[in-house]
Amino acid sequence: GNKVNLPKTYVSFIEAMKGKHPDKRLVMNAVSSYGASQIAGTGKVDFLYNEVWGDEADFTDLYTILKANHQYGNQALKTVFAAYMNYEKGSGEFNMPGILLTAAVMFALGGSHLELGGDHMLCSEYFPNTRLQMSDALKTAVVRYYDFMTAYQNLLRDGGEEEKLTLVCTDASKNLNLNTWPPQKSAITSFARRVNGKQVVHLLNFLSANSLSWRDLNG
């Protein structure tokens, strides 16, 4: 057989799909960012979709992906992550703090998270898998997070310029460790942007984080 450069074939495939169904919305999965630039470069997809795995397991990897996608899509395409939480946990409930921290980071960085399928939260690339359940508290919290993302989507997802912001805790008794992005364990990490003339500051709570991986593998 002949060697095939798969990312290059993405272009003709996507263009053929759009040509056949010009009235349909179109997206293609860049698994582990494979072919992301070629997919974005077609100008035929409605957003960029990244399924992230162990080779992109850290919160800083999410930041890197979003910056790259921003360039690939000429600052016009937004990013949705397929990121399966608590992947190695065999049964029980999702770990609520891990779920919400990952959501908070993704939203702050300008991305969003495909994490619900049908009537359940996704723990696997096999979407019907329901081995993990959402607690009632998590169900309530997720709705509030989505309400927040929807209400403030212009500030979260309209681009802007990243700013380095130094924060100082004025209450010495709190003894809080504050740092600017990238995140650190046992710290509150700030991430700031200037969006449409407004300064947007996110405070991401890593005070009790036991790792800097979004995956929270074992919950």
Question: Where are each of the predicted segments found?
Answer:
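Glycan-processing catalytic domains of CAZymes
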Residues: 1-183, 192-193
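Carbohydrate-binding surface patches
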Residues: 174-219
